[in-house]
């Protein structure tokens, strides 16, 4: 995913957190903030230290990014959102990661059309 699709600055993360607009399931939490007029969505990914070591956390982040790339055409363009992996997301297969992440994105109304891959 290109850099223009990422939220990297702490201040931008905090702005999205402060909206208190979140949806969660057992594996992931998604915070979102409406940004009317934005060309494309932006996403921040956070995996806490409760999940393994740095190598393992990066592995989880790669799976989240891959899932987002696969559903990218369906994602709304007028939002910034954060995906936070809970400790239950540790050890998920790629298929399980996609299923759980798509579920929480649907609950947050971030996907334009219902997807149950």
Swiss-Prot record:
Gene3D superfamilies: 3.30.230.10. The keyword Transmembrane helix does not apply. Its EC number is 3.1.26.5. It catalyses: Endonucleolytic cleavage of RNA, removing 5'-extranucleotides from tRNA precursor. Keywords: Endonuclease, Hydrolase, Nuclease, RNA-binding, tRNA processing. One of its GO terms (biological process) is tRNA 5'-leader removal. One of its GO terms (molecular function) is tRNA binding. InterPro entries: Ribosomal_Su5_D2-typ_SF, Ribsml_uS5_D2-typ_fold_subgr, RNase_P. GO terms for cellular component: ribonuclease P complex. Pfam families: Ribonuclease_P. Consists of a catalytic RNA component (M1 or rnpB) and a protein subunit. RNaseP catalyzes the removal of the 5'-leader sequence from pre-tRNA to produce the mature 5'-terminus. It can also cleave other RNA substrates such as 4.5S RNA. The protein component plays an auxiliary but essential role in vivo by binding to the 5'-leader sequence and broadening the substrate specificity of the ribozyme. Belongs to the RnpA family. NCBIfam families: rnpA. This is Ribonuclease P protein component. The lineage of its organism: Bacteria, Bacillati, Bacillota, Bacilli, Lactobacillales. The gene is rnpA.
